[in-house]
C-alpha cells in the first residue's frame, strides 16, 4: 500500500485537475449559450433559402441550371466541418467514422472522394488516414464569418462547375440539445429533392430580371454558402455542448477518485497508527 504522503500528493493533484475541468466546464457553458444565439439567428435565413431553392427545383424553369441536374457519379466532394480544439468527447471521431463509412460505400463503387476541411482536427485526421484533402481552413475561433469559409467552398464549387465533381456534400454535427449532437451528411449539389409535400404537388412559374442564368448562378451559390455557414455554427454549438458535458464528467470523476483516494489514505493512516501502537505495546512488554 502506498504511503500516506504519496496518497496526499495524489489527492492534491486530482483536486488541482478538478479545478481546471470545472473552470473549462463553466467557460464552455458560457460559449455554448453564445453559439446557440448565433445558430438561432442564422437558422431562419438558411431555412428560407432552402425553401426558395426547393420552389425553384420544382418550378417550370426557363433555364435548367447545372446545379439542378443529376450526373453520372465518378467523383464526390465533401465539405467537412470539425473543431479546432479537442476535449469535446467523441464529437469529432463519431463524425469521422460516419464519413469514412460513406466514403467506403463510394470507393467500393469505384467513385473517388475529395475533401475540403474546415477545422484542424479534421485536417490532421484525414491527412493521417490518407484522405485526399484539396482545401482547408483552420483557426476560425468562436465567431466564424462567411468570408473565412469562402476558400474551401469556392474550391469545391469550381471543381463542380468544371465537371471534376459530380456530387457535393456537407458533413457536420447537428445540434439537437445540450446532451445530443448528431453527425449528419447532407447533399448540397445537385440540389436534392425536397421532402415537403406542398412542393411535390405544386409548381411555380417565375419571371426573371435581368435573366434566369445570372439570377440562378448567384442564388444557388448563396444557397450553398448559407448551408455551409449554418453547418459551421451548428457544429460550434455542438462543440461547446460536448465540451461542457465532457468537462462535467471529468469533474465528477475527479470527485469520485478523490473519495477513493481519501479512503485509501484513511486506511494507510489507520495501519500506520496501529503499527505504532503495536510497537509501543511490544516495547513496554519487553521492559
From Swiss-Prot:
Protein location: Cell inner membrane
Task: List the InterPro entries hit by this protein, alphabetically.
Answer: ATP_synth_F1_ATPase_gsu, ATP_synth_F1_gsu, ATP_synth_F1_gsu_CS
Q: Name one Pfam family in it.
A: ATP-synt
Q: Which GO terms describe its cellular component?
A: membrane; plasma membrane; proton-transporting ATP synthase complex
Sorted alphabetically, which PROSITE patterns does this protein's record hold?
ATPASE_GAMMA (PS00153)
How is it placed in the membrane, per its record?
Peripheral membrane protein
- Highest rank taxon of the organism: Bacteria
Statement: the UniProt record of this protein carries the keyword Membrane: yes
Keywords carried by this UniProt record = ATP synthesis, Cell inner membrane, Cell membrane, CF(1), Hydrogen ion transport, Ion transport, Membrane, Transport
What is the protein's quaternary organization?
F-type ATPases have 2 components, CF(1) - the catalytic core - and CF(0) - the membrane proton channel. CF(1) has five subunits: alpha(3), beta(3), gamma(1), delta(1), epsilon(1). CF(0) has three main subunits: a, b and c.
Q: Which family does it belong to?
A: Belongs to the ATPase gamma chain family.
**Which named protein is this?**
ATP synthase gamma chain
User: What's the name of its gene?
Assistant: atpG
Amino acid at each position: 500500500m502506498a504511503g500516506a504522503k504519496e496518497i496526499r500528493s495524489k489527492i492534491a493533484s486530482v483536486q488541482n485537475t478538478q479545478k481546471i475541468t470545472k473552470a473549462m466546464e463553466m467557460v464552455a457553458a458560457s460559449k455554448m449559450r453564445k453559439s446557440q444565439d448565433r445558430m438561432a439567428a442564422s437558422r431562419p435565413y438558411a431555412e428560407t433559402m432552402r425553401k426558395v431553392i426547393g420552389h425553384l427545383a420544382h418550378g417550370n424553369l426557363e433555364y435548367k441550371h447545372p446545379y439542378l441536374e443529376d450526373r453520372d457519379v465518378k467523383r464526390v466532394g465533401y465539405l467537412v466541418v470539425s473543431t479546432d480544439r479537442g476535449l469535446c468527447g467523441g464529437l469529432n471521431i463519431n463524425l469521422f467514422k460516419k464519413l469514412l463509412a460513406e466514403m467506403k460505400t463510394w470507393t467500393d463503387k469505384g467513385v473517388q472522394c475529395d475533401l475540403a476541411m474546415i477545422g484542424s482536427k479534421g485536417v490532421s485526421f484525414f491527412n493521417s488516414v490518407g484522405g485526399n484533402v484539396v482545401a482547408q481552413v483552420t483557426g476560425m475561433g468562436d465567431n466564424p464569418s462567411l468570408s473565412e469559409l469562402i476558400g474551401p467552398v469556392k474550391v469545391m464549387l469550381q471543381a463542380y462547375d468544371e465537371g471534376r465533381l459530380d456530387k457535393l456534400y456537407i458533413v457536420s454535427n447537428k445540434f439537437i440539445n445540450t446532451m445530443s449532437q448528431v453527425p449528419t451528411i447532407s447533399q448540397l449539389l445537385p440540389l436534392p429533392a425536397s421532402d415537403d409535400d406542398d412542393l411535390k404537388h405544386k409548381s411555380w412559374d417565375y419571371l426573371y430580371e435581368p435573366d434566369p442564368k445570372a439570377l440562378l448562378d448567384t442564388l444557388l451559390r448563396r444557397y450553398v454558402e448559407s448551408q455551409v455557414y449554418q453547418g459551421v455554427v451548428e457544429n460550434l454549438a455542438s462543440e461547446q455542448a460536448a465540451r461542457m458535458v465532457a468537462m462535467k464528467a471529468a469533474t465528477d470523476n475527479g470527485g469520485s477518485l478523490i473519495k477513493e483516494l481519501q479512503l485509501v489514505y484513511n486506511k494507510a493512516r489507520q495501519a500506520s497508527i496501529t503499527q505504532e501502537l503495536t510497537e509501543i505495546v511490544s516495547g513496554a512488554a519487553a521492559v
